[in-house]
């Protein structure tokens, strides 16, 4: 292999580094990755890609984006990734200053209460990624890191199939990150087997600039075609005939928290409201295209004056507002809400059920058949049945992930993490 390498030049970035070319083009791609990782510590250059997409419409400040970029220099390449949470997306109760920290009534506690940045990395080969990450970031791992990347990956594949390193700090930036195999993320977006990450992606997120173009495009398409559409459909089946725009986004946001054991004391019970109220435009950017492309036959959009309009009109107004305020980092005035009215008839109801993810659809259709046997064919299925199905999926994955966290974070970090969550809940 060595004799097939050709010396091109010395690196201008680091005189100790040589730029090599291999006769095998596939190996050249490998060397590019290694070189990027070598430079990441000393002369970090993150290639900024155009991630101006529906998920990236949020209240993330430029300062927060800089902090995220600072963290990304630490890690090996990923296929897709996103940032989420109160440290990234504006939430009521977390009024961030220019440095991305949280304003509080007690300035002395500002640093303590500053929300951490949450990162998710989707990688093609978890064992290889952890192997690379352990070289420079072994301190991020619990005792499992000492057992090697193979063991770390095995633990990752359990349950929700994500491995978290938490309660970390770099240059004053608090953060945690989760690693999932790319194919497992796609599976959750399509089939809702855990709703662990698909639930987070039902809300505004910040797509990482180190995501590959291919990965970003594919995830966006799958998220829109399956995950976001299913979130709207599920919410329509749970909501009454007439409901507000806020009701829709609130119901969607609650899906991934229904059954989450962290909501029983360790997570802020107003979390869903706090997410929605500061990000109405972000939710509109996510869901009006879905409604316009797939669900107009099931929904009317009613303005405050009672007029019915196509959802695309509201979306265009939202985009104009976004362009007019592109230099603002927070919403200065609450956007006007619209009211939805679902077109409830047996055929529409059945059509919506048929679009749900596989296991949920099977159970709901079974209930329909039972109703037909009882001569209740004109009655809708009790929405609590659908709610309970979502509850079971989320509770199973959240409980398993919490237990797994004791091993991936270590007992001490796990206790500290829960303590921080409880403090956050008391705000």
From Swiss-Prot:
- Report the enzyme's class at the first EC level: transferase
Membrane as a keyword of this entry, yes or no, is yes
Q: How does it sit in the membrane?
A: Peripheral membrane protein
Q: Which InterPro entries match?
A: Tam41 (IPR015222)
Q: Can you supply one Gene Ontology CC term for this chain's record?
A: mitochondrial inner membrane
Coarse class of the protein's main subcellular location: mitochondrion
Record keywords: Magnesium included? Answer: yes
Q: Polar residues bias: where?
A: 94-106
Q: Name one GO molecular function term.
A: phosphatidate cytidylyltransferase activity
What EC designation does it have? 2.7.7.41
According to its UniProt entry, the protein's GO biological process terms are:
cardiolipin biosynthetic process; CDP-diacylglycerol biosynthetic process
Out of the domains of life, which is the source? Eukaryota
Q: Where is this region: Disordered?
A: 94-113
Its UniProt entry gives the catalysed reaction(s) as: a 1,2-diacyl-sn-glycero-3-phosphate + CTP + H(+) = a CDP-1,2-diacyl-sn-glycerol + diphosphate
Cellular localization per UniProt: Mitochondrion inner membrane
Q: Which cofactor does it need?
A: Mg(2+)
Tell me the pathway.
Answer: Phospholipid metabolism; CDP-diacylglycerol biosynthesis; CDP-diacylglycerol from sn-glycerol 3-phosphate: step 3/3
Alphabetic keyword roster: Lipid biosynthesis, Lipid metabolism, Magnesium, Membrane, Mitochondrion, Mitochondrion inner membrane, Nucleotidyltransferase, Phospholipid biosynthesis, Phospholipid metabolism, Transferase
Kindly list the residue ranges recorded as spanning the membrane: none
One Pfam family assigned to this protein is Tam41_Mmp37
What protein family is recorded? Belongs to the TAM41 family.
| Function, in words | Catalyzes the formation of CDP-diacylglycerol (CDP-DAG) from phosphatidic acid (PA) in the mitochondrial inner membrane. Required for the biosynthesis of the dimeric phospholipid cardiolipin, which stabilizes supercomplexes of the mitochondrial respiratory chain in the mitochondrial inner membrane.
Q: Which PANTHER family match?
A: PHOSPHATIDATE CYTIDYLYLTRANSFERASE, MITOCHONDRIAL
Protein name listed in UniProt: Phosphatidate cytidylyltransferase, mitochondrial
**Organism for this UniProt entry:** Dictyostelium discoideum
């Amino acid at each position: 292999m060595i004799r097939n390498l050709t010396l091109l030049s010395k690196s201008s970035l680091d005189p100790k580094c040589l730029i090599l070319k291999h006769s095998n083009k596939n190996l050249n791609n490998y060397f590019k990755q290694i070189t990027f990782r070598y430079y990441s510590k000393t002369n970090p250059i993150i290639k900024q890609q155009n991630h101006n997409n529906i998920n990236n419409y949020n209240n993330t400040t430029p300062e927060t984006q800089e902090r995220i970029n600072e963290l990304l220099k630490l890690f090996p390449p990923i296929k897709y990734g996103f940032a989420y949470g109160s440290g990234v997306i504006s939430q009521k109760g977390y009024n961030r200053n220019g440095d991305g920290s949280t304003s509080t009534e007690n300035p002395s506690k500002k640093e303590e209460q500053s929300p951490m940045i949450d990162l998710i990395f989707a990688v093609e080969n978890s064992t290889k990624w952890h192997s690379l990450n352990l070289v420079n970031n072994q301190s991020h791992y619990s005792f499992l890191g000492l057992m090697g990347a193979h063991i770390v990956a095995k633990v990752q594949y359990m349950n929700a199939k994500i491995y978290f390193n938490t309660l970390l700090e770099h240059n004053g930036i608090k953060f945690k990150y989760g690693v999932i195999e790319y194919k497992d993320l796609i599976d959750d977006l399509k089939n809702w087997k855990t709703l662990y990450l698909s639930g987070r992606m039902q809300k505004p997120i910040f797509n990482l600039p180190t995501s590959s173009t291919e990965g970003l495009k594919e995830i966006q398409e799958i998220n829109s075609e399956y995950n976001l559409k299913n979130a709207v459909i599920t919410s329509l089946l749970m909501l009454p005939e007439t409901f507000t725009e806020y009701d829709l986004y609130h119901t969607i946001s609650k899906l991934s928290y229904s059954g989450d054991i962290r909501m029983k004391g360790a997570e802020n019970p107003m979390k869903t409201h706090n997410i929605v109220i500061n990000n109405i435009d972000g939710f509109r950017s996510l869901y009006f295209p879905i409604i316009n492309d797939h669900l107009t036959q099931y929904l009317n959009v009613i303005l405050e004056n009672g007029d019915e309009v196509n959802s695309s009109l509201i979306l265009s107004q939202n985009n104009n507002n976004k362009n007019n305020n592109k230099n603002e980092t927070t919403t200065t005035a609450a956007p006007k809400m619209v009211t939805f009215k679902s077109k409830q008839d047996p055929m529409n109801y059945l059509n919506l059920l048929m679009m749900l993810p596989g296991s949920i659809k099977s159970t709901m259709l079974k209930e329909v058949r039972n109703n037909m046997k009882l001569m209740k064919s004109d009655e809708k299925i009790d929405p609590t049945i659908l709610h309970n199905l979502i509850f079971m999926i989320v509770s199973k994955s959240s409980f398993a992930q919490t237990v797994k966290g004791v091993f991936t974070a270590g007992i001490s970090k796990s206790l500290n993490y829960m303590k921080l969550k409880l403090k956050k809940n008391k705000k």
